[in-house]
Amino acid sequence: MTNINLATDVVIISGATASGKSSFAISLAKKVKKAVIINADSAQVYTNAPILANIPTEAERQGVSHKLFALQPITEYFSVMMWLQLVKQEISQAQAKGMLPIVVGGSAMYLLSLLEGISPIPSNILYRTKAENLYEKKRSSRVCQPC
């Protein structure tokens, strides 16, 4: 294995759905011994969908630290900007502990935001509220209409 600097290096594993990213990351983490796996999959941040999101099982995670998996209910708002703030913290904490951060997932927007940055567009509550109200109005009108 190539020399790895645990203070500065980050491994990123990306690929298509069901391509073996998680199992490869786990085997790499076990080989390195001082590593932490950090989620970069937009579906795996949610708690209510472990099968749908294919979150590694407890048995698969055994002996390897996993971060940013199953963070919050699928009904709660979560954005790439929120993930970016969290992943940067996790990477810094891992490096401070002398651990190799292994960022793994298939969400290109998450990975690109980590590698290239993202514009910090402020949330506009007025537009968000209007959009949510319009969605609720349209949704309820479709649900209530007879077939």
How does the language model describe each region?
Residues 1-147:
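Phosphate/pyrophosphate-binding catalytic cores of soluble transferases and nucleic-acid-acting enzymes
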